[in-house]
Amino acid sequence: MSKQLQARRLEGIDHNPWVEFTRLSKEYDVVNLGQGFPDFSPPDFAVQAFQQATTGNFMLNQYTSAFGYPPLTKILASFFGKLLGQEMDPLKNVLVTVGAYGALFTAFQALVDEGDEVIIIEPAFNCYEPMTMMAGGRPVFVSLRLSPAPKGQLGSSNDWQLDPTELASKFTPRTKILVLNTPNNPLGKVFSKKELELVAALCQQHDVLCFSDEVYQWLVYDGHQHISIASLPGMWERTLTIGSAGKSFSATGWKVGWVMGPDNIMKHLRTVHQNSIFHCPTQAQAAVAQCFEREQQHFGQPSSYFLQLPQAMGLNRDHMIQSLQSVGLKPLIPQGSYFLIADISDFKSSMPDLPGAMDEPYDTRFAKWMIKNKGLSAIPVSTFYSQPHHKDFDHYIRFCFVKDKATLQAMDKRLCSWKGEPQA
């Protein structure tokens, strides 16, 4: 065909590191600690809810309401309304989407116009930038700044902080949206109330919307508390809060997400949704509705999955932190999420010439080397930064610790073999 096939809005966003690292992980015999999914079963009540949805009411095989299965939007409005301090209308304040990815894409398409600026806090999940660009917006990046831990001590995700002056400098008359992710992927940073108040004050001062990606909100450790920015004074009316059933109930394949916010904003998302996806799978929504109804009854009690999951994953996190240190990796202790990052600076000094393209960041070459030579997969943290900042943050790799005990034991065996081998 003589005409250009690719739409201009796709220029510069065609490369996806997840595709490459998924392919490598399948080509080699690896323990997959790169991709963020549990390799253990969802809780029994969730499995039973899904089974019931597929074998019970035959009408669950048909379309449901376009903006969400009514029992699901009702329980989401009730459950999160209490947490956010809002009387939420299931029909006006909640939209069910194909995963949190779908919620984000719908929000960007609905609200970002040509030339609008979108502030993205780095490191950031790497869909925010291409979604901004596909909508015609211009991403504006601000990096969390690291205050190194004292020598001999492990660092923490809390060591990464916003510089208030730098953040304020990113706001211009063209700024439309700030994207917030707490707990943060890949750092595992849980933004404090003080940090959220800084973001909230700037959003209100400059009349900017906030997209708050909170898919890991139940996975917080060591007594840290997740705070939804929409719960702060003056923020409900300018915030879209995004959640994920897959992350909440360890069932990422269900692909059920949601977005919540004020009706005057949500109505534009409904316009995009009804002209693209229109309906999400009914049976998965029915299962998620049952799961939340169960959690509402048990919320705050030891029987709540939202308490049990972080307790179990906190142990996994501690196990991985101890194990990774045995080969010279330096993990940073995460406050939340599925992930931790590890500093590979010592390897960069002792093994600087790993195979790979000259323009490839060191952490990308290291992650590929580790897959091929050590049988362990992780994700280079430079992929969570904009192109100009890749080389500044090329000495970290991200591991997922939300894994089965057998997977962690397999990791230990690979690390034990690695420990007994020469580095190169």
Curated annotation (Swiss-Prot):
Which Pfam family would be a valid example here? Answer: Aminotran_1_2
CDD domains noted in UniProt: AAT_like
Q: What is its main location?
A: cytoplasm
Obligatory cofactor(s): pyridoxal 5'-phosphate
Give yes or no: UniProt keyword Zinc.
Answer: no
Q: Which GO terms describe its molecular function?
A: cysteine-S-conjugate beta-lyase activity; glutamine-phenylpyruvate transaminase activity; kynurenine-oxoglutarate transaminase activity; protein homodimerization activity; pyridoxal phosphate binding
- Provide the positions where the record notes the PTM N6-succinyllysine: 82, 413
Q: Which reaction does it catalyse?
A: L-kynurenine + 2-oxoglutarate = kynurenate + L-glutamate + H2O; 3-phenylpyruvate + L-glutamine = 2-oxoglutaramate + L-phenylalanine; an S-substituted L-cysteine + H2O = a thiol + pyruvate + NH4(+)
One cellular component (GO) term of this entry:
cytosol
Q: Which SUPFAM superfamilies match?
A: PLP-dependent transferases (SSF53383)
Which pathway does it serve? Answer: Amino-acid degradation; L-kynurenine degradation; kynurenate from L-kynurenine: step 1/2
Its Enzyme Commission number?
A: 2.6.1.7, 4.4.1.13, 2.6.1.64
Q: Which residues carry this modification: N6-(pyridoxal phosphate)lysine?
A: 247
Q: Where does substrate bind?
A: 36, 185, 398
| Localisation | Cytoplasm, Cytosol
Disulphide-bonded residues: none
Q: Which GO terms describe its biological process?
A: biosynthetic process; kynurenine metabolic process; L-kynurenine catabolic process; response to bacterium
Q: Which UniProt keywords apply?
A: Aminotransferase, Cytoplasm, Lyase, Pyridoxal phosphate, Transferase
The record's subunit annotation is:
Homodimer.
- UniProt similarity note: Belongs to the class-I pyridoxal-phosphate-dependent aminotransferase family.
What does this protein's UniProt record list under function?
Answer: Catalyzes the irreversible transamination of the L-tryptophan metabolite L-kynurenine to form kynurenic acid (KA), an intermediate in the tryptophan catabolic pathway which is also a broad spectrum antagonist of the three ionotropic excitatory amino acid receptors among others. Metabolizes the cysteine conjugates of certain halogenated alkenes and alkanes to form reactive metabolites. Catalyzes the beta-elimination of S-conjugates and Se-conjugates of L-(seleno)cysteine, resulting in the cleavage of the C-S or C-Se bond.
Protein name (Swiss-Prot/TrEMBL):
Kynurenine--oxoglutarate transaminase 1
Q: Which organism is it from?
A: Mus musculus (Mouse)
Which gene codes for it? Kyat1
